[in-house]
Amino acid sequence: LWTKSPNECTDEEYKEFYRKVFLDYKEPLFWIHLNMDYPFNLKGILYFPKINTEYDSIEGTIKLYNNQVFIADNIKEVIPEFLMLLKGVIDCPDLPLNVSRSALQNDGFVKKISEYITKKVADKLIGMCKTDKEAYEKYWDDISPFIKFGCLKDEKFCDKINDYILFKDINDKYQTLPELLAPVADD
């Protein structure tokens, strides 16, 4: 599924793929289809899982492939730490295979992949907040741990997503920080 173009895939195909690959009966909240050809080739799908209770396993699984051949789960050097809660599949034929993990940590190419994934996650969240704030609010309790941890771990991610972090106001309604501060600025 990840090798297809995103507009060739249906929601039902994404959900079925998620159930089969991750053996999870709960539907994911939403997903991001990665499809990049330049400056490196990267395809994949990242799912935001639904976390129902504090007892749910919040450990994700990111399966790394090279030319559709499975390589490993949860390569921390490729996936930013705060996104290790996600579930997904990433296929990167350009990734060097015959290197140690310590070499991967210092590889500029691997860092670019990690930054690209972080940017795509931030773009998806910002886009959702701007175009479908109701859905964003509905998902907030499940996605806020990802976002808050990401803000602590990644300064660029924090700078990008900062205005889209939600807080409850005194009326128990979700507001972004700029929305909460707007009445104060008017005074």
Model segments located where?
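Conserved GHKL (Bergerat-fold) ATPase module
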Residues: 1-187
